[in-house]
Design a protein with these regions (language model features):
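Conserved loop->alpha-helix
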Residues: 37-259
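N-terminal chloroplast transit peptides
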Residues: 1-36
């Protein structure tokens, strides 16, 4: 796994429409694969839940971002050669840690399009993307693949703002402040967390401020977009699911017994 190691959106309103929506983890079509269109073979209408490892495979470039209305957009990405070999319409790809469904494939074999629903635009940093900007990507894991990071679902819980970056000779320390402070209870020192789809190890946690830090090694900075992030930038955060279950179970147990 990667070693331990643009503005924030703490509001619960939709970033492009100003409409309030209830917060929930984002899953942009990874459960149901319906009405796929464009070039290429189609998958069955329902496919198993996608799984990712948190090991970012590389960077893709935004070729276009179309706002089809105030609650729906289409994102087209350009990928390195052969990245999309064997991919089908309906396949799942993690883009900055957000599970998206391929809805179109380019004739050149290096581009794919994804539809972004209102919840994705509100809850992630994808709605702020500009043409030419780079994003992290990971194709869904297959049976037999090594889980070198930790299990990542692609369901983004919130965004976080970069509030501090400290470079040393061989490492970079990055401090994040989560947009939803209630989630900081699930962020534990030495625990896993997904940051823009990267499986990282948490360093220190400041629960009062809703902050945590990670340390990034040179390879992580080279392969992912985290190497280009600066103070004020935003990232997508996915809490590690087992940690969330354990914390919630303990809290419920103690509450039932009046502890």
């Amino acid at each position: 796994m990667f070693a331990s190691s643009s503005s924030s959106s703490s509001s619960s309103t939709f970033a492009r429409g100003g409409v309030a929506f209830k917060k929930r983890a984002v899953d942009d079509g990874c459960r149901a694969k319906t009405n796929a269109f464009g070039r290429g073979r189609r998958r069955p209408s329902v496919s198993p839940r996608a799984l990712f490892t948190g090991l970012v495979q590389g960077k893709a470039t935004v070729r276009s971002f179309e706002n089809l209305d105030d609650q729906f957009a289409r994102l087209t990405l350009g990928f390195p050669e052969r990245t999309l070999d064997g991919i089908l319409i309906g396949a799942s790809v993690a883009v900055n840690g957000t599970c998206l469904t391929v809805t179109r494939l380019g004739e050149d074999g290096t581009s794919a399009s994804f539809d972004l629903i209102v919840e994705t635009l509100r809850a992630t940093n994808l709605g702020r993307l500009e043409v030419g900007e780079e994003v992290n990507y990971e194709r869904s894991a297959r049976v037999g693949d090594e889980i070198g990071g930790h299990t990542v679902s692609g369901h983004v819980h919130c965004t976080a703002e970069i509030v501090e970056v400290v470079d040393t000779e061989l490492n970079r320390k990055v401090v994040f402040e989560v947009s939803d402070k209630k989630l900081i209870k699930y962020v534990l020192p030495k625990g896993f967390i997904s940051v823009d789809g990267c499986s990282l190890t948490v360093g220190e946690v400041d629960k009062e401020k809703g902050r945590f830090n990670v340390w990034l090694i040179p390879e992580t900075l080279r392969v992912t977009v985290l190497g280009d992030k600066v103070v004020g930038g935003t990232v997508n955060i996915e809490i590690e699911s087992q940690t969330q279950v354990i914390v919630d179970t303990i809290e419920r147990y103690m509450a039932e017994r009046g502890l």
